[in-house]
């Protein structure tokens, strides 16, 4: 009777970095699939704001889900705006308008100013 294949140990939940180790299953090497997440960036921002504070893997999962959700909402709204204006390209203007439509009051103002600052920094570095 053949033994059931043993699953490989699960990767640590903290920071979901890319794993390049190969697993051996039935004598064949198989690479682990890469899990993309924003955990590295969330951690960097946390350390900028509160250097002495940590974050649990569950909280990191929630933050990752939140960033993905906001990204999809902004991208969807920007896509709709480009379509309404018969444009085939989403520019920073569509993103800015989408942010103004999606985020409430003061939060939208701060997001727009931070976004403008980031775009300026990026274009000046080119």
UniProtKB/Swiss-Prot annotation:
Protein name, per record: Histone H2B type 1-K
N6-lactoyllysine: residues bearing it: 6, 12, 16-17, 21, 24, 44, 86, 109, 117, 121
Cellular component terms (Gene Ontology): nucleosome; nucleus
N6-glutaryllysine PTM positions: 17, 35, 44, 47, 109, 117, 121
Cross-link Glycyl lysine isopeptide (Lys-Gly) (interchain with G-Cter in SUMO2) mapped to chain: 6, 21
N-acetylproline modifications at: 2
Lineage: Eukaryota, Metazoa, Chordata, Craniata, Vertebrata
Modified residues (N6-methylated lysine): 117
Organism annotation: Bos taurus (Bovine)
Homology family: Belongs to the histone H2B family.
Encoding gene per record: H2BC12
In-chain residues carrying the UniProt-annotated modification N6-crotonyllysine: 6, 12-13, 16-17, 21, 24, 35
Residue numbers spanned by region Disordered: 1-36
Omega-N-methylarginine PTM sites in chain numbering: 87, 93
PTMs per UniProt: Monoubiquitination at Lys-35 (H2BK34Ub) by the MSL1/MSL2 dimer is required for histone H3 'Lys-4' (H3K4me) and 'Lys-79' (H3K79me) methylation and transcription activation at specific gene loci, such as HOXA9 and MEIS1 loci. Similarly, monoubiquitination at Lys-121 (H2BK120Ub) by the RNF20/40 complex gives a specific tag for epigenetic transcriptional activation and is also prerequisite for histone H3 'Lys-4' and 'Lys-79' methylation. It also functions cooperatively with the FACT dimer to stimulate elongation by RNA polymerase II.
Cross-link (Glycyl lysine isopeptide (Lys-Gly) (interchain with G-Cter in ubiquitin)): 35, 121
Glycosylation sites: 113
